[in-house]
Amino acid sequence: MAPILFLPILQILLIYCTKSAQAQLNISIGSSLTPQEVNNSWISPSSDFAFGFRAVDGNSSSYLLAVWFNKIADKTVIWYAKTSSNGQDDTIPVQVQSGSVLKLADGALSLRDPSGNEVWNPRVTDVGYARMLNTGNFRLLGTDGATKWESFGDPSDTILPTQVLPLGTALHSRLLATDYSNGRFQLNVQDDGNLVLYLVAVPSAYYHDPYWASNTVGNGSQLVFNETGRIYFTLTNGSQINITSAGVDSMGDFFHRATLDTDGVFRQYIYPKSKQARSLWQEQWRAVDALPENICQTIQTKVGSGACGFNSYCTFDGTKNTTNCLCPQRYKFFDNERTYKGCRPDFEPQSCDLDETAAMVQYEMTPIDRINWPLSDYEQYSPIDETECRRLCVIDCFCSVAVFNKPSNTCYKKKLPLSNGNMDSSLQATVLLKVPRSTNSPSMISSGSSKWKKDKKYWILGSSLFFGSSVLVNFLLIFVLLFGTYCSITSRKKTQLSQLPSNSGLPSKIFTYRELEKATGGFHEVLGTGASGIVYKGQLQDECGTNIAVKKIEKLQQEAQKEFLVEVQTIGQTFHRNLVRLLGFCNEGTEKLLVYEFMSNGSLNTFLFNDTHPHWSLRVQVALGVSRGLLYLHEECNKQIIHCDMKPQNILLDDNFVAKISDFGLAKLLPVNQTQTNTGIRGTRGYVAPEWFKNIGITSKVDVYSFGVILLELVCCRKNVELEVADEEQTILTYWANDCYRCGRIDLLVAGDDEAIFNIKKVERFVAVALWCLQEEPSMRPTMHKVMQMLDGAVQIPTPPDPSSYISSLA
């Protein structure tokens, strides 16, 4: 009886051992795979990856030959076989029906359809065996163990950690998520050493102008996705260009991939792998970095439709790192699934036989909110007012969109097809779309031209008899009033300009005090207060109702006037994603006001110091954003700018929590050949560098010191100085962080913050960077360029010296 009972157990063990062996041993000559059967894939030893037949999404009778993530529910495809299309350079995905066979025989790997015709082979011979590696790489090897062919060497749209793309290779996006044909975008590692993203004119392989390039012609070497999760482009001199900066999540805790998506964005993704990661994160792919950051704004091609199809526009969601293509009102997609084909009007196009009056009756210009097609202009008028701009487009049968720029009184006309459409929140112009009037009936439209031609002369005759006697007087009165108002406003604005430096790089808009008083509702809603004034929320009386923040300088002393001029001069000559944009100013007598773009998520101070910790990923995003902004001020402006008052209150967050540096009232501008300056003490207690209290020159390193304090506050979600803490040693964050770092107890700084604990390696890195920034000796502090490299993980961080004094500025 015992042997009989033991037999089933032995069979189970044999089955288990056989499956385990299949996942670990070499794939030998004679092995084969077929769709729709248990034996349809070869699995890596870790079971993380599989190579074989995968059903095409939405088509259970068609199969790809592919490599995929085997432990993820949706079996994400990372490689798929392609074959040449009619002998041309472009390729198509290999798709076969059930009954097809993939066989490793006679020293070669061959895929044949049910009729026995070969549909794919990797074109290598003398193959001894194959392997599905734990890296996701499928290899064919000779009997001597040398690699004959590998999937890593013939990439599709995705690369994985440990994968390298040498010169002459490329990634091709898919046409759709479910259509594996070559799509509209390519990432090329060119033979000339340049790494380039191209828009492609499908179905051909013709490239339009690149929308991103590394600009390394003659110097580029290879694109690397290393084992730590960093993606960079190496140069022939050994240096590196970071392509993404997200190499921070443990390879043991997350699956990683980088894919050229169907929208043209090269994104790096992670997926929770370990039990601990799955307990903290949703089991789905999460984008942690992207190139370009906002493709809607990046692609501006002279030929081609742009990021989306013709007559459509592109929108970008920064919180989800996604793009979307939409049609403007009264337009619809040619194909709702294949939106890249663009949009068409849902109404009959305007007839060129209509006279002006009939066109005005049948069509109107309706404003659309911050949507623009920047390269579709075919006519321009200036100077002109908005009413005339509308009229000129309505009566022109070619015109579909008009853009009126109020500051310059310029009108631009655009005709179909419209290209490079995007949603632009910074757009200050009024965009007008021509559509049929809603009151039009079909009979009215068809007969409008003849009817108005017939009646027009009678209408003109009657109205001229009735109004003829008074029109001249009315015209003269209106002209006098308008001319007087114009002269008054012009005089005030000239006075404002005369009080400012001639080379100040002023913003384009000069406001009157009355305009800003009206925009803020009488300075009613307070957003915040500072040493030199109060900031109010307002709304411009433009077509878009643009929200603004108005800083009203309250102090009338000479120092306040100086700060006002410094701020106008400083921000007026800067433009960067991580700097708050100055839209305009008012300088009427004692009234000094600055008009900024409105930041909907307030200051970092409010965001960071509350009862709930913001997500770790958002804090990292803010830290990187602030560092980029400071790098721009210190090293990338025409004149070096030292902010001098970096603190959380002066870092604002927009709709997508992008950090923007603000409040340049204490800033110092240095000529190109000058690196330090002498000035009085500036800044805010707790963030001021020690050299402010010494008789030495001030350099950009004072901002680096302040950034070190802010970085620690971002890590720990607490202020630098907190008097009401249980442990006196924790009162001053910079002291406590140094002690924790020296003792190897960084975890104490983020106790109770599960996300930070999970990313403890990056927490340790950020703390080390902060301690370098907080060195008392300015020359010991890194530049912001070096800070960026350390935060990104691009360079090793040596152990920072123990600073002799963090808060000498508090004494």
Swiss-Prot record:
Keyword Membrane included in the entry's annotation: yes
Reactions that this protein is recorded to catalyse: L-seryl-[protein] + ATP = O-phospho-L-seryl-[protein] + ADP + H(+); L-threonyl-[protein] + ATP = O-phospho-L-threonyl-[protein] + ADP + H(+)
Disulfide bond positions: C296-C314, C308-C325, C327-C343, C389-C411, C393-C399
Keyword annotations from UniProtKB, A to Z: ATP-binding, Disulfide bond, EGF-like domain, Glycoprotein, Kinase, Lectin, Membrane, Nucleotide-binding, Plant defense, Receptor, Serine/threonine-protein kinase, Signal, Transferase, Transmembrane, Transmembrane helix
Ranges of the Extracellular topological domain: 24-464
Gene Ontology cellular-component terms listed: membrane
Domain PAN: 352-436
GO molecular function: ATP binding; carbohydrate binding; protein serine kinase activity; protein serine/threonine kinase activity
Superkingdom of source: Eukaryota
Family assignment from sequence similarity: Belongs to the protein kinase superfamily. Ser/Thr protein kinase family.
Protein name per the record: G-type lectin S-receptor-like serine/threonine-protein kinase LECRK2
Organism, as annotated: Oryza sativa subsp. indica
Gene name linked to the record: LECRK2
